Curated annotation (Swiss-Prot):
It is found in: Cytoplasm. The lineage of its organism: Bacteria, Pseudomonadati, Pseudomonadota, Gammaproteobacteria, Enterobacterales. InterPro entries: UreF, UreF_sf. It comes from the Bacteria. Its main location: cytoplasm. Transmembrane segments: none annotated. Keywords: Chaperone, Cytoplasm, Nickel insertion. Belongs to the UreF family. UreD, UreF and UreG form a complex that acts as a GTP-hydrolysis-dependent molecular chaperone, activating the urease apoprotein by helping to assemble the nickel containing metallocenter of UreC. The UreE protein probably delivers the nickel. This is Urease accessory protein UreF. The keyword Cytoplasm applies. Gene3D superfamilies: Urease accessory protein UreF (1.10.4190.10). It holds the Pfam family UreF.
Amino acid sequence: MTDARQRLRLMQLASSSLPVGSFTWSQGLEWAVEIGWVKNAEDFAHWQTQQLEQNFFTVDLPIFARLYHACERNDVTAARRWSAYLLACRETRELREEERSRGAAFTRLVVDWVPDCPQTWRPLFANSQLCGMAWLGVRWRIPLTDLALSLGYSWLESAVMAGVKLVPFGQQAAQQLILSLCDHYAQGMAQALARPDADLGSSTPLAAIASARHETQYCRLFRS
């Protein structure tokens, strides 16, 4: 695949129009707004930075790197182990349901784009979008760092768009938040990808509480 086609595939994977339901989950933000933990754009920036530093950098990205390398080796056993580890790190039923829902949606895309995708890999994709994205990146020969940039941007944009609806704040503030959060992401991405096994794990108890409480929140915009 040419460099131009790789870049275009990368932009497609980062697109907000990708039908995986990324804008239907708030990851606890809706309850955090309801209870008053997040009242404005400044509070949101603090909240999302915590999720980035203590969850995405310590769980999602390092496990994504391991999944990518497992796909390079065609090592289904290793990919299965890390997919299960990722799911175990999702601390609430809602977060695990989001992981599986996004995974199932992404699996449909992978099968449509790559009809000869091996049957042995498909159940792993259905458990986690990260596994499907890693496999597709290897198939399309997209470097891990480029794929990680796409993954991070998509995650941050989805979070900010949830904030626009819930906090709320305007589109100009949203773009400024995306800009600053992306700068923070770029600074920490390489270290997160190289994180050793002994340092894997999240530390976001408030986010876990918010997600658990959101499951029974009386009035909500986002799925649970």
